[in-house]
Swiss-Prot record:
Subunit of the V1 complex of vacuolar(H+)-ATPase (V-ATPase), a multisubunit enzyme composed of a peripheral complex (V1) that hydrolyzes ATP and a membrane integral complex (V0) that translocates protons. V-ATPase is responsible for acidifying and maintaining the pH of intracellular compartments and in some cell types, is targeted to the plasma membrane, where it is responsible for acidifying the extracellular environment. Subunit C is necessary for the assembly of the catalytic sector of the enzyme and is likely to have a specific function in its catalytic activity. It comes from Rattus norvegicus. Lung, kidney and testis. Expressed in both bronchiolar and alveolar lung epithelial cells. Isoform 1 is predominantly expressed in the lung while isoform 2 is strongly expressed in the kidney and testis. GO terms for biological process: positive regulation of Wnt signaling pathway. V-ATPase is a heteromultimeric enzyme made up of two complexes: the ATP-hydrolytic V1 complex and the proton translocation V0 complex. The V1 complex consists of three catalytic AB heterodimers that form a heterohexamer, three peripheral stalks each consisting of EG heterodimers, one central rotor including subunits D and F, and the regulatory subunits C and H. The proton translocation complex V0 consists of the proton transport subunit a, a ring of proteolipid subunits c9c'', rotary subunit d, subunits e and f, and the accessory subunits ATP6AP1/Ac45 and ATP6AP2/PRR. Belongs to the V-ATPase C subunit family. GO terms for molecular function: identical protein binding; proton-transporting ATPase activity, rotational mechanism. This is V-type proton ATPase subunit C 2. InterPro entries: ATPase_V1-cplx_csu, Vac_ATP_synth_c_sf. The gene is Atp6v1c2. PANTHER family: V-TYPE PROTON ATPASE SUBUNIT C (PTHR10137), V-TYPE PROTON ATPASE SUBUNIT C 2 (PTHR10137:SF4). Keywords: Hydrogen ion transport, Ion transport, Transport. CDD domains: V-ATPase_C. GO terms for cellular component: vacuolar proton-transporting V-type ATPase, V1 domain.
Length: 425
């Protein structure tokens, strides 16, 4: 499953034993895989400031999740024919999202734990806001390009009445630069081809004999040329319409046709060069990604290999700027999101369990959807004794307190936050 439960309990002896009981029961019943989730010690500040931060982090959490989902959807749209390999391009620091979450380690260089919590939150908020601003401008430019290209493509795929003729006609099909003569294009139903050949010369005076030629056709009819004197154009149109032959308003302009063809070529080239897709992950250790060391301490299984032993290495090739930007900044936004989750656990744990700071965070990955109800029952049973501590801290679980974001629906004896990696659902 791509679902995780991030919980915490007080770090005293009694509750550490409760965590071990939880791990034992969930392991034997095959309910979940549990991993310690390391969160650094931060400067706590006042409890009032923590309540405010709790509210701000809740909003930032929602914003970050929405942002990475939008970015994931943008990757889908850009990759077009390679949509089946989208997940290979949705990585965090060069590894798949599940590996990053289960091997999470706080980035001290980017978000120093020695800074006040409010500064760390502000850094995360500004980073995500900038990514969203850039996402809007880049995807807007892509949408304009795509729309312009689709409009030109529609003109090339319609019927003979509406489609562009620049890719059908040629200079040789027309009498040009004549003071007296002009070549018209006439759409003739397929059932009337024979009638057209027999009557077009007599539809009006001054029609050049044997001047008609079929130059294109679709399922409904054909496009014929006919040359006549300019002064009988209107008369010819009227007589043609009476016979269900439609004169297409088109006059050969070599410069305009050249411009239209060049525009199509330019748009196709822009889309290919600027937004070309690749299903290969960015090369590990490139300037784009900082090497990320990962470390994990699984409960009851200290010999489990670390993520570094399974790092993926592949070299990106043929990536256009938009896809490359999306991959890099999706990674940055996702990493920021998991850091926000860690901060929420820290802040909520201090508000719940009090000072001095002493709690243990654990990441649970339910093995299957059908087991989540049983897993919740196990957790509620193991940590039932925390109700008294929580009640003393939050006064009344049935009353929503600004910042704590608790209610009857989502209140549990332990700190709990949900992480869902189903970003494309």
């Amino acid at each position: 499953m791509s679902e995780f439960w991030l919980i915490s309990a007080p770090g005293d002896k009694e509750n550490l034993q409760a965590l071990e009981r939880m791990n034992s029961v969930t392991s034997k019943s095959n309910l979940s895989h549990n991993t310690k989730f390391a969160i650094p010690d931060f400067k706590v500040g006042t409890l009032d400031s923590l309540v405010g931060l709790s509210d701000e982090l809740g909003k930032l959490d929602t914003f970050a999740e929405s942002l990475i989902k939008r970015m994931a959807q943008s990757v889908v749209e850009v990759m077009e024919d390679s949509k089946g390999k989208v997940h290979e391009n949705l990585l965090a620091n060069g590894v798949d999202l599940t590996s990053f979450v289960t091997h999470f380690e706080w980035d001290m260089a980017k978000y120093p734990a020695k800074q006040p919590l409010v500064s760390v939150v502000d850094t995360l908020a500004k980073q995500l806001a900038q990514i969203e601003t850039d996402l809007k401008s880049r995807t807007a430019a892509y949408s304009v390009l795509k729309a312009n290209l689709e409009n030109l493509e529609k003109k090339s795929t319609g019927n003979l009445f509406t489609r562009t003729l620049s890719d059908i006609v040629s200079k040789e099909d027309f009498v040009l630069d004549s003071e007296y003569l002009i070549t018209l294009l006439v759409i003739v139903p397929k059932s009337s081809y024979v009638q057209w050949q027999k009557t077009y010369e007599s539809l009006s005076d001054m029609v050049v004999p044997r001047s008609t030629k079929l130059i294109a056709e679709d399922n409904e009819g054909g496009l014929f040329t006919v040359t006549l004197f300019r002064k009988v154009i209107e008369d010819f149109k009227v007589k043609a319409k009476e016979n269900k032959f439609i004169v297409r308003e088109f006059y050969y302009d070599e410069k305009e046709i050249k411009r239209e063809r060049e525009e199509m070529t330019r748009l196709l080239s822009d889309k290919k060069q600027q937004y070309q897709t690749s299903c290969v992950a960015l090369k590990k250790g490139s300037a784009t990604y900082r090497d990320h060391k990962v470390k994990v301490t699984p409960l009851g299984n200290p010999t489990r290999p670390t993520a570094g032993q399974n790092d993926r290495e592949s070299e990106g090739e043929g990536e256009g700027p938009l896809l490359r930007w999306l991959k890099v900044n999706f990674s940055e936004a996702f990493i920021a999101w998991i850091h926000i989750k860690a901060l929420r656990v820290f802040v909520e744990s201090v508000l719940r369990y009090g000072l001095p700071v002493n709690f243990q965070a654990v990441l649970l990955q339910p093995h299957k959807k059908s087991a989540t109800k049983r897993l919740r029952e196990v957790l509620n049973s193991v940590f039932r004794h925390l109700d008294e501590v929580a009640a003393a801290s939050i006064l009344d679980a049935s009353v929503e307190i600004p910042g704590l974001q608790l209610s009857n629906q989502d209140y549990f004896p332990y700190v709990y936050f949900h992480i869902d990696l189903s970003l494309l659902d």
